[in-house]
From Swiss-Prot:
Organism field: Oryza sativa subsp. japonica (Rice)
Gene Ontology biological process terms, A to Z: regulation of transcription by RNA polymerase II
General function of this protein: Component of the NF-Y/HAP transcription factor complex. The NF-Y complex stimulates the transcription of various genes by recognizing and binding to a CCAAT motif in promoters. May regulate the expression of photosynthetic genes, and may be involved in chloroplast and amyloplast development.
Localization, UniProt: Nucleus
Annotated protein name in UniProt: Nuclear transcription factor Y subunit B-2
Designated gene of the protein: NFYB2
Subunit structure, interactors included: Heterotrimeric transcription factor composed of three components, NF-YA, NF-YB and NF-YC. NF-YB and NF-YC must interact and dimerize for NF-YA association and DNA binding. Interacts with NFYC4 and NFYC6.
Length: 178
């Protein structure tokens, strides 16, 4: 399980304010470094390139702006999920908490597809853990076929398949059918 340092959420500071004191100056010591506040620009760029034509170009400031927006979005959703966990006296935020938060914050149209993705992801991870425990504790490369779903690369492949099906540029509307 991946653990996140959510120190920037304390005191109500958003991502745009994180890393600066009241005067707007960068922190002296122990503050949040920029690379800890934002996702890597290369990852942002790679995702953005999937949404534009092959010959399309993306300006550096557009990438940097989206990098900040994505980080703020993560903070926004995580903060809402954290509030839910605190009310329920739990310390660990799970996938369902994040989906609940997204629905609460007005992103309802993403909740059902993400529930499906989360379920399939957990199946893949579960298969991977079972395969690892079955033998000598390691997953054999030659036993993992393209459809076995038993490796972390399968889980990573799911991300690409899922995001391609999301239709970045066009909202997905359904007439009550899921």
């Amino acid at each position: 399980m991946m653990m996140m340092d959510l120190g920037f959420l304390e005191g109500g500071a958003g991502m745009a304010d994180a890393g600066h004191d009241e005067s707007g100056s960068p922190p002296r010591s122990g503050g949040v470094r920029e690379q800890d506040r934002f996702l890597p620009i290369a990852n942002i760029s790679r995702i953005m390139k999937k949404a534009v034509p092959a010959n399309g170009k993306i300006a550096k400031d557009a990438k940097e702006t989206l990098q900040e927006c994505v980080s703020e979005f993560i903070s926004f959703v995580t903060s809402e999920a954290s509030d839910k966990c605190q009310k329920e006296k739990r310390k660990t935020i799970n996938g369902e908490d994040l989906l609940f938060a997204m629905g609460t914050l007005g992103f309802e149209e993403y909740v059902d597809p993400l529930k499906i993705y989360l379920h399939k992801y957990r199946e893949v991870i579960g298969d991977s853990k079972l395969s690892s425990k079955a033998g000598d504790g390691s997953v054999k490369k030659d036993t993992i076929g393209p459809h076995s779903g038993a490796s972390s690369s399968s889980a990573q492949g799911m991300v690409g398949a899922y995001t391609q099906g999301m239709g970045y540029m066009q909202p997905q509307y359904h007439n009550g059918d899921t």
